[in-house]
Amino acid sequence: MTQVAKKILVTCALPYANGSIHLGHMLEHVQADIWVRYQRMRGNQVHFICADDAHGTPIMLKAQQMGIAPEQMIAAMSQEHQQDFAGFNISYDNYHSTHSEENRELSGLIYGRLKENGFIKNRTISQLYDPEKGMFLPDRFVKGTCPKCKAADQYGDNCEVCGATYSTTELIEPKSAVSGATPEMRESEHFFFDLPAFSDMLQAWTRSGALQEQVANKMQEWFDSGLQQWDITRDAPYFGFEVPDAPGKYFYVWLDAPIGYMGSFKNLCDKRGDLNFDDFWKKDSDADLYHFIGKDIVYFHSLFWPAMLEGSGFRKPTNLFVHGYVTVNGAKMSKSRGTFIKAGTYLQHLDADCLRYYYAAKLSSRIDDIDLNLEDFVQRVNADIVNKVVNLASRNAGFISKRFDGKLADKLADAELYKTFTDAGASIAEAYSSRESGRAIREIMALADIANRYVDEQAPWVVAKVEGRDADLQAICSMGINLFRVLMTYLKPVLPALTQRTEAFLNTELSWDAITTPLLSHQVNPFKALFNRIDLDKVSAMVDASKEDMVTAQNVVSGPLADNPVQDTINFDDFAKVDMRIALIKQAELVDGSDKLLRLTLDLGGETRQVFSGIREAYPDPAKLEGRLTVMVANLAPRKMRFGISEGMVMAAGPGGKDIFLLSPDSGAQPGMQVK
């Protein structure tokens, strides 16, 4: 009976759009890609998607530091991320962004359904506020001591030591991560998702087999502690989606981030005519939905996400596949040691297949951390891929090419041995299917040892010197190449670049189902080097370059600050001499004879000043400035100009021309007030 192809949708966690992809990120994307490639080899219909997580205060603040719009920053970051994933041959069908119309519509739809179904609650909360920056502080911008385990230097929403979640107000001795100031408590109305209403459903789902045992056990601890309502809104200023019918309130990034899976798939469906969004996301969908994620975001994916889907009438994930962290040389990745390696830096020095293989050899279905030991990395890749697999082809291909014009023998030299190799496919397939790629690699390398032992025993280099044994030589070498073909078929999900070169050499596609039929009387192409041995010097150069990346990141910041550095330090007495006041622009008009100046009539609350300001290009319709409050230097000596006397200076930011921005105070300021 022919097995019916499965419909599968696979996602990876969305990389945050405020930084580069590093080798820690790549573990997840490689793991998922290996699993996806295996499923595709077995004939299943797999759609593999991802997107950038592009909202939140960190992105807003970083864009401000760079002097660019958040949209500009996330667009550049998306391009870099996609280039890195392509360099590692991650076979995404679609890569999108949470800052998209698809995601805006779906976020609004899900929120609307949750609200209509009674799962959204409104209440006024006390929230930490940075008095220096004039903004409410989101969870990740408050740091302090965990209220559960008392670990220091933890974020305001969850503890990286014990995994607990809490509100920022529970944090002990909080500090603003933006300014370092001690936050103040202020009140604000927020919207909450009623997570406790889904407790029974979530507990049943937890034990349904949808989660690894380690994850299910951790979730039970959260259930025992009691689920809390989840704050899903943030106050302006915030870069994200404004909540419908709630001006100044924005969806918290963790609400629209997982919806980004749906948004990316919707974008793919709109591009193609053969995909139906509802077939994969409707309540009774028969498609499989798998999320590959790291253990640091289990809470959001195992509680909030399935509850949101359930409450809004969509299907829940079939399974969450959770992995551990990456360490390098037994320690946390370090910029100072050069082990915080960006994906782009790696690709400048080494073949992507090398890291894919090393990760595959270490991965299992458990949530264990993976150590990238750089010396072991070099030794294992060279020993396994070069010495065992590729060497098997090179030892035999030369004879086939030179002595037999690239033609393989018409029968197998050892049919029983070949059957041993193809029979092993069932166990290797089961390992891949269950995400036990480490076990699959061990079984494949055991076969590689057998294949090389066969060649050693048959010694084709000796047979080649014996007159009249051409048929034996062709049979031995053809057997070696057929065994190489089976090995590379099993390695195809792991080594896509080497697979492509192998298929060119063998003159055939590597197919799992095809290996039961050996290549007999088959024409292969002239052998070319398939894989280069890793040179330890290249690894050292990569580490050194990563140290240089850190120095560059520390010393070169793009944006206004880099273009116009801070001036020499002045003392407080010098600064105190400058008297800045709030001024009301009563009249603003063009200056005849000047293409740069505007004449401003300013009210200082009892005194009127005339100021000439070079802001005409930025404000071509000066009447729009009238009635606006601004800041002026009130004690600047009057300056006689061709058009009249200027009695001060208004304050503005920007490089000049059209890019200049008049400063305005917050509401409540009055003309004449001193700016301190």
Curated annotation (Swiss-Prot):
Key words, A-Z = Aminoacyl-tRNA synthetase, ATP-binding, Cytoplasm, Ligase, Metal-binding, Nucleotide-binding, Protein biosynthesis, RNA-binding, tRNA-binding, Zinc
Q: Which reaction does it catalyse?
A: tRNA(Met) + L-methionine + ATP = L-methionyl-tRNA(Met) + AMP + diphosphate
Q: Where does Zn(2+) bind?
A: 146, 149, 159, 162
Q: Which Pfam families match?
A: Anticodon_3, tRNA-synt_1g, tRNA_bind
Cofactors needed by this protein, per the record, are:
Zn(2+)
Q: Reply yes or no: does the keyword ATP-binding apply.
A: yes
A GO CC annotation recorded here is: cytosol
Localization terms from the record: Cytoplasm
Q: What is its main location?
A: cytoplasm
Cofactor remark from the record: Binds 1 zinc ion per subunit.
Q: Which residue ranges does the UniProt annotation give for the motif 'HIGH' region?
A: 15-25
Annotated EC: 6.1.1.10
Q: What does this protein do?
A: Is required not only for elongation of protein synthesis but also for the initiation of all mRNA translation through initiator tRNA(fMet) aminoacylation.
Q: How does it assemble?
A: Homodimer.
Family in the record: Belongs to the class-I aminoacyl-tRNA synthetase family. MetG type 1 subfamily.
| Stated name of the protein | Methionine--tRNA ligase
Species name: Pectobacterium atrosepticum (strain SCRI 1043 / ATCC BAA-672)
Lineage, broadest ranks: Bacteria, Pseudomonadati, Pseudomonadota, Gammaproteobacteria, Enterobacterales
Q: Which gene encodes it?
A: metG
